[in-house]
Amino acid sequence: MWRYPVKSMQGEQLESIEVAAAGLSGDRSWALRDLETGLTLTARRCPELLFARGLLIDGSAVVRLPDGTETADSATLSSWLGRDVELVAASEEAATYEIAADAEDEAGSPWRTWNGPGHAFHDSGRARVSIIGENTLRAWPVRRFRPNIVVTGGEEDSLVGSSLRSDGGVVLDVSAQIQRCVMISRPQPGGIERDLDVLRTVNRERAALLGIGALVATAGRLSVGESLVPV
């Protein structure tokens, strides 16, 4: 299991976590806001975000920059990115994101915007918890796809429309397959290189869909090693 305290930054691998309506506790609970545009930044616009790590310390976010500096200071974060930003917590208000219309030519492409849900910085209100099967990943690094849960034992696409119950009683309503974008082609620490062929392959062979998104029907604690069984 993984959670990503600051949107579009590196996250942390977990053994056990509380799950509630907004998703895994602390997941995508903070983000950087561009003070000039008012938009919530992602690695679609700022690939550099993937080289920082979001940390939760006493309920507040801290960003570990590529040089090891840990900060929540707006001036320091702005200097790093070369734009005026502030670190903000999720609220009930929807965040606005942007994406290039053409992933092959981002510099020359128009950018479109959309609103995500409130209470956490998820891209879609239909996916508060993201799930990917090991078989679906092939040889791709799991970190390219930034899932919350990696499962074994079969094809996850067939679970759309069903409910999954964990051994501990958490119930997830699987609502949709997850549409992929240029994020999965971005470079990341640890030798993950920029690779548009990953996105091209997912677009060509899977109609741009990889992984499934779920809503939380019954909250509780979820741990690695538990089964998720259709009910």
Model-identified regions with their sequence ranges:
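Metal-cofactor-dependent catalytic cores
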Residues: M1-V231
